[in-house]
Amino acid sequence: MAFVYILECADGTLYTGWTTDLAQRLAAHNAGRGSRYTRGRRPLRLAYWEEHPTPRQARRREAALRRLRRAEKLSLIASNPNEEGV
């Protein structure tokens, strides 16, 4: 099982990533052990996530989400069926 996620950073930017352990990855991002991009943009809020059966599928979906425009990502976040978070 793997997850694709979008984080909303403190400065309003969006970060897209994938992981096999969503709760652990979110904690790592918020502790400054995540990606270089998110380290200086804490705190981070999990705005959107999807579950995929394999890491390969999650990576492909991540690549597709990264190509979206900001407005398209915000629309996806607004329609989030997983609003309750992790």
Residue ranges and their predicted role:
Residues 1-86:
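GIY-YIG nuclease catalytic motif and its immediate N-terminal context
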